[in-house]
Amino acid sequence: MSSNTSAPSLNALAGPLVESLVADAAKLRLIVAQENGARTVDAGANARGSIEAGRRIAEICLGGLGTVTIAPIGPVASWPYTVVVHSADPVLACLGSQYAGWSLADEDGDSGFFALGSGPGRAVAVVEELYKELGYRDNATTTALVLESGSAPPASVVNKVAAATGLAPENVTFIYAPTQSLAGSTQVVARVLEVALHKAHTVGFDLHKILDGIGSAPLSPPHPDFIQAMGRTNDAIIYGGRVQLFVDADDADAKQLAEQIPSTTSADHGAPFAEIFSRVNGDFYKIDGALFSPAEAIVTSVKTGKSFRGGRLEPQLVDASFV
């Protein structure tokens, strides 16, 4: 149950999706195991994984409050297969669940493990200040976290998550896949709507006024090199991503939001992400945060029926990244 009685339980909605993923492990090319007391699902480290696994993992990340589909047509003509994300509750789905806001590191051992946790487990632990703004907590008895990682979480991380959620390790499922994998790259591109919501939050737009949202971005081909793989998934969104938000706001606020969301607002816009990353010597904190946004935004005011646009697609930069 959620502590906010007007909001659904993310884990109650995502739970059946997790169990379905586990049940279909063989056909999705996943490896399910028990490690350090928790259930783990390898979706792309030692397992081959699949695009379909990535699509379904993305829906788990959304806490069961969104749909993710692969469409045969998209905004970038030369890369037509597109990840399409829709949520009728994008604030809770994207910020309350999908956003990778929980830093998890092996603080007790020497494994060097580090990953950002996303998914409905965040809403049980509520270790992030964001949940005070959302006014949401999910009092679930089982939960799941998705990790962008090439290995299962060590015991210290499992125990940290168990302590924060108040659940026994056996009641937590960790789903993990590196960016270089089919599933990993797919679930990252499926964050196209989430980064728009994050930008709306960053610029101070009233989140309660965001009613619905749709996003799309080209399905990036995986790459065995981590930097190249990370670059491709980012470029899919930064230069090929498009979102439409439906807001209960007046025209001036809708127009301003459409202008504020896109990646074109960033001083770092204009080069493939791997090139930008190399330019700052691999220091994420030196990259302008405004870059992590979709290329184009459409914001529709349901009050007036008018729509406003900002940003632009850069298909040539998608091509430069993907080839």
Swiss-Prot record:
Record GO biological process: formaldehyde catabolic process; one-carbon metabolic process
Superkingdom as given in the UniProt entry: Bacteria
Q: Which UniProt keywords apply?
A: Cytoplasm, Hydrolase, One-carbon metabolism
Reaction catalysed by this chain? 5,10-methenyl-5,6,7,8-tetrahydromethanopterin + H2O = N(5)-formyl-5,6,7,8-tetrahydromethanopterin + H(+)
Molecular function (GO) terms listed? methenyltetrahydromethanopterin cyclohydrolase activity
Keyword Cytoplasm on entry? yes
Location of the protein in the cell:
Cytoplasm
Q: Which SUPFAM superfamilies match?
A: Methenyltetrahydromethanopterin cyclohydrolase
- Pathway participation: One-carbon metabolism; formaldehyde degradation; formate from formaldehyde (H(4)MPT route): step 3/5
User: EC number(s) per UniProt?
Assistant: 3.5.4.27
Main subcellular localisation: cytoplasm
Coiled-coil boundaries = none
What the entry lists under Pfam families is as follows: MCH
Any one Gene Ontology cellular component term annotated for this protein: cytoplasm
Q: Which family does it belong to?
A: Belongs to the MCH family.
Q: Which NCBIfam families match?
A: one_C_mch
* Protein's job: Catalyzes the hydrolysis of methenyl-H(4)MPT(+) to 5-formyl-H(4)MPT.
Name of the protein this chain belongs to: Methenyltetrahydromethanopterin cyclohydrolase
Q: Which organism is it from?
A: Methylorubrum extorquens (strain DSM 6343 / CIP 106787 / DM4)
State the taxonomy lineage.
Bacteria, Pseudomonadati, Pseudomonadota, Alphaproteobacteria, Hyphomicrobiales
